[in-house]
């Protein structure tokens, strides 16, 4: 069993997102909690991938054509830290 931790601003981001996207995120979260990030690779629609450059060390999964969930696997512990759900804009906020 994996633990999913969410950044404090995630609740606000999801509240602004369409209901369909919120449901898709909950499905994503269920898969991660049960199977871990490896389970995401079995679902082609998520197109889970490692990020590069300033997001090196993070991963991204598609929730729909526009929105992505950006997350990080914390060490060898069974923890996934969700940073944000974004409309495909990977610029880091300070």
Residue spans for each PLM region:
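Arg/Lys-rich, positively charged N-terminal/basic patches that mediate binding to nucleic acids
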Residues: 1-33
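Residues that recognize and position ribonucleotide moieties
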Residues: 3-4, 44, 83
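A broad, low-specificity signal marking well-ordered, structured residues that form hydrophobic/aromatic
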Residues: 4, 49, 80
């Amino acid at each position: 069993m994996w633990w999913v931790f969410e950044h404090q601003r995630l609740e606000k981001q999801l509240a602004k997102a369409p209901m369909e996207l919120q449901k898709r995120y909950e499905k994503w979260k269920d898969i991660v909690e049960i199977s871990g990030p490896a389970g995401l690779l079995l679902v082609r629609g998520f197109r889970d991938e490692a990020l590069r450059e300033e997001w090196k060390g993070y991963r991204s999964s598609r929730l729909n054509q526009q929105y992505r969930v950006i997350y990080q696997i914390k060490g060898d512990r069974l923890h996934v830290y969700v940073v944000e759900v974004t409309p495909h804009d990977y610029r880091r906020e300070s």
